[in-house]
Amino acid sequence: NQVIAATPKPLSLKVAQTPPNEWGLYDMCGNVEEWCLDWYGPYIDKEQTDPVGYSDGIARVTRGGSHNTPVKYLRSANRMAMLPEDKHTMTGFRVVQAEYPQTAPLSQPKDEYVVSQIKWDWNSQCVTEPVFAAPLVYVHEPDVHSGTPFFKHNHQPALTWCDNGDLLAVWFSTNEEKGREMVVLSSRLRAGSCEWEKPRMFYQIADRNLTGTALLNDRQGTLYHINGVEAAGHWQNLMMTLRTSTDNG
């Protein structure tokens, strides 16, 4: 039972009460979500036979669900994601004995986004007079063909400075604040620029609500990103995750 509750109650774990699917597996759409061995990553634009996913990543695939799981996420074709360190009442696993495919795993797409690593001289930019300027909008719609998801509700920003002089802003983009479609996007105001860049994907755990984001520069060369990750939708059972960057984000 996947009702989102702050205090989950014990439920029956009895299985195999309905017929199995074509592969002889019971309860693929009637019990808890189940871990898959695959690392989560984007689909590639070509046919594959016996795909085994990616060789690495930050989250692994889960599938399935139970009563009160929205049908969109309950479909066997739907791939959710979950951090390997996470655990909660909505996800379990099973052992299936079969020959492992010989297909080679995919490599994660290379991020070619370039950020300056030259340390900014803050003292050279010091001013002693008041500065007045119009606000700079940091939430822009992404390019249509960029592949960056962008929803109608963009909210809860966090912002910090980078050692290279850039400003980094992040926020969540979603249709509903309780939604599982939520992603965290980022934009950068590069040193000397007067316009924030188009948004990029900053953090995504597919089909998990990601309410709660913070950024911090520790003044010793490290940026900290703290973010909540839900068991499903809503924001009642969030765990806190931490990532660091030593290359200006």
What positions do the PLM features span?
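Short, well-ordered surface patches within globular domains
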Residues: N1
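Surface-exposed recognition segments
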Residues: A5-L13, Q17-T18, E22, M28-K110
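Asp-box/BNR beta-propeller blade signature and adjacent active/binding-site loops
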Residues: L106-G249
